[in-house]
């Protein structure tokens, strides 16, 4: 969902309808859908026709008198393709793009969008209200989104990255050129990012390039920490500045390098796939005592009786480090859908951890928000499920990083206790050969993978009851 702004009710209802009829492997009545969406039966039928136009040819939306509605889709295809198509049509998204990347007056923007000026005003006012939570506002002359430059960029990043299926709205910027530069930075740092983290960083680079080309630079030094020039992440970004200038015609000054260095650090922090100990060496010694203090306090409250080894504590260090850094680039990894899911599924653990964090020194707990609390909740719940279940050949591949992958793995082990064994080797670039070497029988993934000869079950970001049903059938 486009979390930083409201989107049209019709788009929201279409997406909600799609997810609702996909959650369970059964027929739904018009009345059920009407009650769920809180609209008339006639409106439900209209939405079903709209949905039929959006789904791929390989899917089938069956509507039969006396039976109801049933969504038939291949196991290896996800809802994200359809959700992405719907969200890209959002008028509010188009308006935000115009306000960030182009120069307009109210009259010229209304003309572009084929609207009357009077119809455009309330939409602009609603967007202005929505973006205040991102510390931004809309200026009328010229008509643009205004605020700290880094906040404007991260706002657009959140818009784009909440559209599934690797949305790339930059026809004038070759994504492969940016990907090559990020691959180069990975080699310098000897790390590998997960697919989603790399895509997100690519989008931020493209937004930064677009803003720099239109003369918008980060000059509020007091609002952005300047990374030490001897820091590995700063030096890594600095090493590609000449290539950025040659390829895109932009010059990165110290504040711009610091901004991208922090984004790089947050991207790596979200999904470390090389040796965590090696990657965290520079700040692990400083943060580990705090990680142990937090873990001890949470264990005292939850009474899980689990042995918290160094591997577990390393991820606590990772979450703390990310919390301390993210205030300089606010909301970089914020995911409201993820937070809601964790709070609803594990309310006691979430509230307990939130209470423990609030008891820390203000200079520490003030950096934590619901996102970090949710990550810690997922991490502790993963240990709880692993502790109570005996792992038993499935490979889980997700786009969201190590903690998310471990969480999904633990959910599956708990659900199919004794029926499956999760293989925990971390491989970013999966091949048929590597999977056969591990004797993998089934792959469970929330992204499309170019793998043949091994069954793939496509799941949602968090498995639905329908996903669990399909997995059970195949195992």
Swiss-Prot record:
Single GO BP term: regulation of DNA-templated transcription
Cystines in this chain: none
Gene source species: Bacillus anthracis
Domain of life: Bacteria
Name of the protein described by the UniProt record: Anthrax toxin expression trans-acting positive regulator
Swiss-Prot/TrEMBL keywords: Activator, Capsule biogenesis/degradation, Plasmid, Repeat, Transcription, Transcription regulation, Virulence
Coiled-coil regions, chain positions: none
Function: Acts in trans to stimulate anthrax toxins expression. It activates the transcription of the pagA, cya and lef genes. It also activates capB, a gene required for capsule production.
Annotated family: Belongs to the AtxA/AcpA family.
Limits of the PRD domain: 169-274, 282-390
Regulation: induction: By carbonic acid and CO(2).
Family matches, as Gene3D superfamilies: 3.40.50.2300, PRD domain (1.10.1790.10), Winged helix-like DNA-binding domain superfamily/Winged helix DNA-binding domain (1.10.10.10)
PANTHER family hit by this protein: CRYPTIC BETA-GLUCOSIDE BGL OPERON ANTITERMINATOR, TRANSCRIPTIONAL REGULATOR MTLR
